[in-house]
């Protein structure tokens, strides 16, 4: 789609933030292989999807700061929303990054502490946190239960995946200008509609078996060719994640 005017991007980002409570979604993706994402979490409001998330410890889920609620019903161990066989655990404590901005989406990362530990199994595993930041061009997979159509919404019952590649900050700034912060990460496929959308926020971007990103924001309607998805770059927050879990264990 080429380079957007900053004013238009600002409007689109505002629209994206207005729908952030529903998160981001997978556009032009495919049904994930069953059980291939045992770290995937659904944050529910009642029985309805609120955001995605990713298990990083038996007591802790990592998600986007804009997914903040007073309490959460956390579903683990199933690729289907509402699966009666899934683990469901209440969570009443969550810790946003202290530098999070609702206006700019900078530091869009949050830890949710489960009220009781998960039961680890082949269907429930913690994701591996990154030892380093992966370079542009790295192949990754993003997953979630967000809407598969935009602007009209169609929420799938099955976990959806999309294969994308990391994009350099230099290239991504051609689209998003100064809206792209230093701890934000872009991913997508050139000339493709493949992207995240409402309902996917906080979900994992996994590259080489490590967590590199959390779904944060993008343009609206979703799936605009050459408008990459924007993620929180987890490798730049590992110290904060470890210290926060230690402080509130």
From Swiss-Prot:
Alphabetical list of SMART domains matching this protein: Tryp_SPc
Superkingdom of origin organism: Eukaryota
GO cellular component: cornified envelope; epidermal lamellar body; extracellular space
Catalytic-site annotation from UniProt: 66, 108, 201
Region feature Serine protease, mapped onto this chain: 26-246
Pfam families: Trypsin
Disulfide bonds: 32-161, 51-67, 133-235, 140-207, 172-186, 197-222
Record entry for activity regulation: Inhibited by Zn2+ and Cu2+ at low micromolar concentrations. Inhibited by SERPINA12.
Top EC class, one word: hydrolase
Extent of the signal sequence: 1-21
EC number(s) reported in the record: 3.4.21.117
Residue ranges annotated as propeptide in the record: 22-25
PANTHER family to which the protein is assigned, alphabetical: KALLIKREIN-7 (PTHR24271:SF45), KALLIKREIN-RELATED (PTHR24271)
Homology family: Belongs to the peptidase S1 family. Kallikrein subfamily.
Biological function: May catalyze the degradation of intercellular cohesive structures in the cornified layer of the skin in the continuous shedding of cells from the skin surface. Specific for amino acid residues with aromatic side chains in the P1 position. Cleaves insulin A chain at '14-Tyr-|-Gln-15' and insulin B chain at '6-Leu-|-Cys-7', '16-Tyr-|-Leu-17', '25-Phe-|-Tyr-26' and '26-Tyr-|-Thr-27'. Could play a role in the activation of precursors to inflammatory cytokines.
Protein name: Kallikrein-7
Natural source organism: Mus musculus
């Amino acid at each position: 789609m080429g380079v957007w005017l900053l004013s238009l991007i600002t409007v689109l980002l505002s629209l994206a933030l207005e729908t952030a409570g529903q998160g981001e979604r997978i556009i032009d993706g495919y049904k994930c292989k069953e059980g291939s994402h045992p770290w995937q979490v659904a944050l529910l409001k009642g029985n309805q999807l609120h955001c995605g998330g990713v298990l990083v410890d038996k007591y802790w889920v990592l998600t986007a700061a804009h997914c903040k609620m007073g309490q959460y019903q956390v579903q683990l161990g199933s690729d289907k929303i509402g699966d009666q066989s899934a683990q469901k655990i209440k969570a009443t404590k969550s810790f946003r990054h202290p530098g999070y901005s609702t206006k700019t989406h900078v530091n869009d990362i949050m830890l949710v502490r489960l009220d009781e530990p998960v039961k680890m199994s082949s269907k429930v595993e913690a994701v591996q946190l990154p030892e380093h930041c992966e370079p542009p061009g790295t192949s990754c997979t993003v997953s979630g239960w967000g809407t598969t159509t935009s602007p009209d919404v169609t929420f799938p019952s099955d976990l959806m995946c999309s294969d994308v590649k990391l994009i350099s900050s230099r290239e991504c700034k051609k689209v998003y200008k100064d809206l792209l912060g230093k701890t934000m990460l872009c991913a997508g496929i050139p000339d493709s509609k493949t992207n995240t959308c409402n309902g996917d926020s906080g979900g994992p971007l996994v590259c080489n078996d490590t967590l590199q990103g959390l779904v944060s924001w993008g343009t609206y309607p979703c799936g605009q060719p050459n408008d990459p998805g924007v993620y929180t770059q987890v490798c730049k927050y590992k110290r904060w994640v470890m210290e926060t879990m230690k402080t509130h264990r």
